[in-house]
């Protein structure tokens, strides 16, 4: 079970949002590169970046911070990024910078053909991020809940060639209320590619529950607020996950 620290970027700083609201941002660091190095030293084997401004603007907005992070850690561990990725040119630019994978979110739901095109152009490098409320996909920074069921979308994107799915239960993210294990397992059982859980991780009990779900295809978990506020010690949590594998 891979635990992946999240670094959410807003105006060049490392923040966490509550329920996806930009006005509900808590600043944790003015130096995202130092934050990335910290998690690497704590034993992180992959990092998850989100360009929050980019997600709302539809184009990259935090390139200096992203470049600094990649300069600090990309030679040692893979880094993935989402937020504002709407075209193939942006994907190519990001991969050229040294990102290992890019995550397509809102654009995947609005324009599923874009995912197929991206997988053809950059095979093995595309992840789709699906955010859901009560099983239905949400888009535009969670502002809109669609009529598309996440399982139907995940199956389509699997056929298109994405390497994994990141699943966020938007009722849980940033609320420290526990991971929605049942919904995550249900999605993982519906596809053959790995599913990464995101949203709501609170403590070691969540780690144990996720490890128990690994046999169903839940390959990892992205953690944010819990490791920044200290309810989870990242190094301890990754050691626990490794011991349960």
UniProtKB/Swiss-Prot annotation:
The record, for InterPro entries, names: Aldolase_TIM, His_biosynth, HisA_bact_arch, Isoase_HisA-like, Isoase_HisA-like_bact, RibuloseP-bd_barrel
* One example GO MF annotation: 1-(5-phosphoribosyl)-5-[(5-phosphoribosylamino)methylideneamino]imidazole-4-carboxamide isomerase activity
What does the UniProt entry say about where the protein is found? Cytoplasm
Q: What is its main location?
A: cytoplasm
Q: Which reaction does it catalyse?
A: 1-(5-phospho-beta-D-ribosyl)-5-[(5-phospho-beta-D-ribosylamino)methylideneamino]imidazole-4-carboxamide = 5-[(5-phospho-1-deoxy-D-ribulos-1-ylimino)methylamino]-1-(5-phospho-beta-D-ribosyl)imidazole-4-carboxamide
- Going by the entry's taxonomy, the superkingdom of the source organism is recorded as Bacteria
Q: Which GO terms describe its cellular component?
A: cytoplasm
Segments forming a coiled coil: none
- According to the UniProt entry, what is the EC number of this protein? 5.3.1.16
What does UniProt list as catalytic?
8, 131
BP terms from Gene Ontology: L-histidine biosynthetic process; L-tryptophan biosynthetic process
Pathway-wise, it operates in: Amino-acid biosynthesis; L-histidine biosynthesis; L-histidine from 5-phospho-alpha-D-ribose 1-diphosphate: step 4/9
Keyword line: Amino-acid biosynthesis, Cytoplasm, Histidine biosynthesis, Isomerase
* Main EC class the enzyme belongs to: isomerase
- HAMAP family registered for this protein in UniProt: HisA (MF_01014)
Family per record:
Belongs to the HisA/HisF family.
- UniProt name for this protein: 1-(5-phosphoribosyl)-5-[(5-phosphoribosylamino)methylideneamino] imidazole-4-carboxamide isomerase
Q: Which organism is it from?
A: Neisseria meningitidis serogroup C (strain 053442)
Q: Which lineage is the organism of this entry classified under, starting from the top rank?
A: Bacteria, Pseudomonadati, Pseudomonadota, Betaproteobacteria, Neisseriales
């Amino acid at each position: 079970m891979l635990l992946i620290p999240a670094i959410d970027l807003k105006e060049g700083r490392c923040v966490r949002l509550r329920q996806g609201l930009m006005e509900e941002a808590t600043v944790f660091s003015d130096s995202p590169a130092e934050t990335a190095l910290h998690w690497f030293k704590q034993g992180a084997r992959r990092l998850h970046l989100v360009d929050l401004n980019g997600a709302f603007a539809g184009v990259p907005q935090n390139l200096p911070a992203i470049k600094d992070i990649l300069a600090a850690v990309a030679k040692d561990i893979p880094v993935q990024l989402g937020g504002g990725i709407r075209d193939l040119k942006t994907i190519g630019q990001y991969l050229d910078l040294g990102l290992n994978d890019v995550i397509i979110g809102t654009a995947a739901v609005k324009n599923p053909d874009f995912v197929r095109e991206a997988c053809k152009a950059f095979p093995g490098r595309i992840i789709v991020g699906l955010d859901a409320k009560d099983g239905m996909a949400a888009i535009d920074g969670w502002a809109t809940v669609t009529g598309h069921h996440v399982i139907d979308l995940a199956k389509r994107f699997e056929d298109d060639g994405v390497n994994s799915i990141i699943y966020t239960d938007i009722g849980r993210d940033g609320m420290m209320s526990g991971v929605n294990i049942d919904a995550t397992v249900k999605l993982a059982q519906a596809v053959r590619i790995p599913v990464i859980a995101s949203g709501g991780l609170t403590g070691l009990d969540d780690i144990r529950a996720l490890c128990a779900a690994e046999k169903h295809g839940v390959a990892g978990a992205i953690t944010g607020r819990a490791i920044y506020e200290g309810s989870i010690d990242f190094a301890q949590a990754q050691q626990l996950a490794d011991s349960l594998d």
